[in-house]
Amino acid sequence: MFRFASDIRRDSEGLVRNPFCIGVGLALLAGPACAQKTERPEVKVGDRWQFVRYYSVASTTPNVTWEINSVSEAEISGTENGEPLRMTPDLNVVDSPERKQSNPKALSFPLEVGKSWRHATDWLFKPKGSSGSIVVDVEVVAYERIAVPAGEFEAFKLVSKGRVSGTSPINSQYDAVITTTYWYAPAPRAIVKSVTHNPYLGVSTVEMVAFQPGP
């Protein structure tokens, strides 16, 4: 069954009490003594997350499920709601049922407060058939506790600002700034919450509802 907040929190509290931060892998690195800097997580076959994505009305009912079925040095692959999902080793989504990107870099490990980077990527938004490019500046701005439907987690807070350009299927032009604030939590090895302000799609929120680690 899925592990909810109480289970993961008990694991992380036990780790904090150990001054040497001895654990069973990055899945438990939730304590402040260990997670002020965090390395790339060890994603495993069988890892499974449930998220809720909503726009105007908040919800806690999951509508997105990720499950990992293959992990290599070059790529992580699995399914999103039963359809193909491909990610980089840093957990950046390359291809999903909703969108495709050439060079996603929302996460760049190791993470620590103050780190920043810039990346450019081509994108395809599948539901509308629109495409274009975006140049994004990302900064890790804080390490704090965040509450989501799955519970409370110690997480790195990141802010990205991207200048997007592109065309729609009817050849109208996109030119705007998209801002996303998101929180990566080492314990469930995932972005547990993101809030995106997109002038064309409105405000969208994604929150983690549950996490089940692989065997």
Model-derived features: positions:
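Acidic, serine/threonine-rich low-complexity disordered tracts
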Residues: Q36-N103, H119-P215
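Bacterial N-terminal signal peptides that target proteins for export
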Residues: F4-I22
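Hydrophobic helical h-region of N-terminal Sec-dependent signal peptides
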Residues: V24-L28
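N-terminal signal peptide c-region/cleavage motif recognized by signal peptidases
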Residues: A30-P32
